Amino acid sequence: MSETTTVETTTTTVAVLVGSLRADSLNRRLAEVLRDQAPEGVVLDIVDGLADLPFYNEDLDAGDAPAAAVALRERVAAADRVLAVTPEYNGTMPAVLNNAIDWLSRPYGAGAIVGKPFGVVGATPTPYGGKWAHADTVRSAGIAGATVVEDVLVSQSALEVDVLTDAEVLGRLTGAVQTLAAYQPATSAA
């Protein structure tokens, strides 16, 4: 009699929010490279439609939320993790990303990102590499209830290197994706 061993494989799905709407966005292309190079067992789902979201307004969210907001919430709720890939605009995160986080934070206490591991990476053509956008996105996501994974920390200046082809930068970025995918929240002893 032969024994068969079954290996259980799990897939971790990461919803990716790109903070730029530009057609040839560096961060959109970066998200696509990360998706294509995702580690085995990790699926990066780039969430489109952020441009279709109206600015968050609680009056719009009473009753029937806009279709774009419902679609965003469903995609993120279905994911295991969230990754923001964002540039920096005028020293902060882009309004489109902030607006998406606002929609995902509601209903209060039960939004699609509440308790969900959340990481932030990005590239920007500034000398500071998007550090301020990174900090603002981390703060906003954390206040909205996400579990920010602090070890997912890559803000890169696109002035220094080609972030889409530089092996060291791509290694740090794919490492950040691996860290986010492998993150296990600390459990408290009862």
Feature names for model-found ranges:
Residues 49-66, 160-163:
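N-terminal beta-loop-helix "entrance" segment that forms/cooperates
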Residues 2-6, 10, 147-190:
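Glycine-rich phosphate/pyrophosphate-binding loop and the adjoining helix
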Residues 21-22, 51, 60, 108, ...:
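Short, glycine/serine-rich, charged loops/turns that create anion-binding
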Residues 41-51, 55, 147-156:
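Short beta-strand elements in bilobed, periplasmic/extracellular small-molecule ligand-binding domains
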Residues 14, 27, 31, 53, ...:
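A general structural signal for well-ordered alpha-helical segments in protein cores
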Residues 9-42:
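N-terminal beta1-alpha1 ligand-phosphate binding loop
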Residues 64-144:
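Helix-loop-strand module that forms the ligand-binding subsite of alpha/beta enzymes
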